[in-house]
Amino acid sequence: MSEQIPKTQKAVVFDTNGGQLVYKDYPVPTPKPNELLIHVKYSGVCHTDLHARKGDWPLATKLPLVGGHEGAGVVVGMGENVKGWKIGDFAGIKWLNGSCMSCEFCQQGAEPNCGEADLSGYTHDGSFEQYATADAVQAAKIPAGTDLANVAPILCAGVTVYKALKTADLAAGQWVAISGAGGGLGSLAVQYARAMGLRVVAIDGGDEKGEFVKSLGAEAYVDFTKDKDIVEAVKKATDGGPHGAINVSVSEKAIDQSVEYVRPLGKVVLVGLPAHAKVTAPVFDAVVKSIEIKGSYVGNRKDTAEAIDFFSRGLIKCPIKIVGLSDLPEVFKLMEEGKILGRYVLDTSK
């Protein structure tokens, strides 16, 4: 029996960038011919959502806006052109809500780089609401019976770090440094790296985060609040420097340090997006060491399916804390203060 779809729902909305977050009644969207209507049960909270709210990236958001792009829920409606889905399927709302599927980037599986990409919680109302729409081609298929609260962070954080590790192209047994390892992306990056056979040196601040990342499989921990020379500490922990570095923190300094501590032929992958930041790399050292500096955006449909498969096989545990949708302003506050361990997940029924 299909679900009765209401006319209005609860959502967290802001009318201006930097404006007040309001938990209020909001219209339930009608899916376009190519879209699913998903009853969002849970949504992760990503640092990108904070940037969308502030409007501090060089890409304009829609306004008013419902943020969120880690929504896990159930298909309750669909447009007439949708194929491959049925009512009752578990579905995920990702950062990439839709793309043109005809440009050179879409044709080579690089849909996130599409010039017409529609972004959940940025240019398209996202998952901080009870009912949301998503392009049926890009929506993530979630296996039946999956714990929707726990899988929610995989839809962005998990896919993003998994793609970054693939971009680093490291071999099993090699070292990878993960900066910001105790946060939402970092805690998943540690686990995906271990599941891929890599040795992990985690970088973050404080004893609590050190214990946390080691419990997830990090072999070594460098504490930026205690180690005076981060570059040397990382090199020492990895016998000369890691073979790759995944920068998920929003620290420009951490990015610059990663260029210094990777060993010759090392690969520096940029994931976190600190506002207005630049990468500074000594050209002589970069050439002589033959290092690579790469950007890694979110994954495509194949990356998403693979990242969810790692989770479904029990190789990835999402360290989550569940709070109500109405608690989003407090979660943003904790995020700005750097006080989040793991990932916050919002229960849209509260």
Swiss-Prot record:
What is a single Pfam family found in this protein's UniProt entry?
ADH_zinc_N
Binding positions for NAD(+)?
A: 180-186, 204, 209, 271-273, 343
Any single GO CC term annotated in Swiss-Prot or TrEMBL for this entry: cytoplasm
Cited SMART domains: PKS_ER (SM00829)
User: Where on this chain does Zn(2+) 1 bind?
Assistant: 46, 69, 156
Binding-site residues, Zn(2+) 2: 100, 103, 106, 114
Q: What keywords does the record list, in alphabetical order?
A: Allergen, Cytoplasm, Metal-binding, NAD, Oxidoreductase, Zinc
At the top level, the lineage of the source is Eukaryota
**InterPro entries in the record:** ADH-like_C, ADH-like_N, ADH_Zn_CS, GroES-like_sf, NAD(P)-bd_dom_sf, PKS_ER
So which cofactors does this thing need? Answer: Zn(2+)
CDD domains linked: CAD3
Query: What EC number(s) are associated with this protein in UniProt?
Result: 1.1.1.1
Provide the disulphide bond pattern.
none
- Reaction equation(s) it catalyzes: a primary alcohol + NAD(+) = an aldehyde + NADH + H(+); a secondary alcohol + NAD(+) = a ketone + NADH + H(+)
Presence of the UniProt keyword Oxidoreductase in the record: yes
PROSITE patterns, alphabetized:
ADH_ZINC
Task: Name the principal localization, coarsely classed.
Answer: cytoplasm
Cofactor binding description? Binds 2 Zn(2+) ions per subunit.
Localization recorded for this chain is: Cytoplasm
**SUPFAM superfamilies listed in its UniProt record:** GroES-like (SSF50129), NAD(P)-binding Rossmann-fold domains (SSF51735)
The reply on keyword Amino-acid biosynthesis is no
GO molecular-function term, one example from the UniProt record: alcohol dehydrogenase (NAD+) activity
Oligomer and partners: Homotetramer.
Q: Which PANTHER family match?
A: ALCOHOL DEHYDROGENASE 1-RELATED
**What family does this chain come from, according to its entry?**
Belongs to the zinc-containing alcohol dehydrogenase family.
Under which name does UniProt file this protein? Alcohol dehydrogenase 1
Give the organism, scientific name.
Candida albicans (Yeast)
